[in-house]
Amino acid sequence: MLKIKLEKTTFENAKAECGLVFIINKDFDHAWVKNKKLLETFKYEGEGVFLDQENKILYAGVKEDDVHLLRESACLAVRTLKKLAFKSVKVGVYTCDTHSKDNALLENLKALFLGLKLGLYEYDTFKSNKKESVLKEAIVALELHKPCEKTCANSLEKSAKEALKYAEIMTESLNIVRDLVNTPPMIATPVYMAEVAQKVAKENHLEIHVHDEKFLEEKKMNAFLAVNKASLGVNPPRLIHLVYKPKKAKKKIALVGKGLTYDCGGLSLKPADYMVTMKADKGGGSAVIGLLNALAKLGVEAEVHGIIGATENMIGPAAYKPDDILISKEGKSIEVRNTDAEGRLVLADCLSYAQDLSPDVIVDFATLTGACVVGLGEFTSAIMGHNEELKNLFETSGLESGELLAKLPFNRHLKKLIESKIADVCNISSSRYGGAITAGLFLNEFIRDEFKDKWLHIDIAGPAYVEKEWDVNSFGASGAGVRACTAFVEEFLKKA
């Protein structure tokens, strides 16, 4: 992990092997730009990166005056620098538009530091010839790129320290998620997932309860159990329950995650090319583990419960079948018409378990539907639920964190598509359209009336796993949901 060191000095006087200068909105006239003629000669127009070897400065373009583009550019700069021979880099402090008047300096520092730190991530556990980055340190000169009010300048050091703490916690939490999701299914079984959660619990002094199939049977979590039937003798399921309890808790929050450690589709078998990357189907459950790490280290004033349903969905003599009817923990019967719509079965029972805790808000995370990716694209997560204020808060705070999110609306016509003639509800829709929403409506069937306005469903199927670098996301798992939900919890508690 890149070490960031804060120094009360100017950018010019800071000592490092290389300088990093951002060209914001094509402004080449700043004093930190050392060789404008060189940039003009090579027709560098303030996008991407350009290395001035003579002055040992890497220029990184920020296309518009936007804090999110600053974060992205910082990440790109570090990805570039780690391929070079520089051990250290220096950078000043920038203040781009945050689209909000509150804490602009702090938000810029968070974006800068997080971008720098996330740029070094690479999952190379199984590579024989690992190429360790030479770049080890970033010196941040506490000098502002452009004049600021005196109050802003006076709070620079304080804001930098707070932002650095945030970036370190968020990077660690995201990397926990990335590593877990990237770990191949031969290793990352439900038991392994529980072991990762136990390590996080031990480090943060959290309560943890890891329940096996006997507990699931006692609690009548038959939908969850059905998904695991083909794996029961080899990789049994685990219900993982993490608890963070601060001394002062304003609210109780339940975070629920789908933890499918591998999903071949069950008897409704996926085509071979669709199975590749299905190790990422534990993205929701992994995000919940990362969130408990982040929220505990940030010391949020809420009692937070993380509930992960960890299982495989495989084929075998005991596999559950299309035409089966399952009785969920909530007592509702489910007609199975497709065993590849399994995540919603696991979540149905986990959401029931979460409601037994009487939380003030429930948020579930799942790589639930390909339809969500078709509808919103691979960069955006979907938000569903009944409470408009809660949905708006998650969307606004999530967008400010740098994640992309959009709301999808429930409606009565789509709800009819999951009706069953022989059970209370069917696990798939009778139509090929609106699949992300009908999956959310299926989950809604297991939300009790008193929790309807306290529940949000987040489908992270698009951005949870990245096959081509974009923004601050390296190849592989992105940790989708962690930044957004952390910001949501902080804003939710401000209103408590």
Swiss-Prot record:
Cofactor: Mn(2+)
Keyword terms: Aminopeptidase, Cytoplasm, Hydrolase, Manganese, Metal-binding, Protease
Binding site for Mn(2+) 2: K258, D263, D281, E342
Keyword Cytoplasm: yes
Protein name in the entry: Probable cytosol aminopeptidase
UniProt keyword Nucleus present: no
Cell compartments where the protein resides: Cytoplasm
Family matches, as PROSITE patterns: CYTOSOL_AP (PS00631)
Positions bound to Mn(2+) 1: D263, D340, E342
Source organism of this protein record: Helicobacter pylori (strain Shi470)
Family note: Belongs to the peptidase M17 family.
Principal localisation: cytoplasm
Gene3D superfamilies, alphabetized: Leucine Aminopeptidase, subunit E, domain 1, Zn peptidases
Enzyme class: hydrolase
Upper lineage: Bacteria, Pseudomonadati, Campylobacterota, Epsilonproteobacteria, Campylobacterales
Known catalytic reactions: Release of an N-terminal amino acid, Xaa-|-Yaa-, in which Xaa is preferably Leu, but may be other amino acids including Pro although not Arg or Lys, and Yaa may be Pro. Amino acid amides and methyl esters are also readily hydrolyzed, but rates on arylamides are exceedingly low; Release of an N-terminal amino acid, preferentially leucine, but not glutamic or aspartic acids
Protein EC: 3.4.11.1, 3.4.11.10
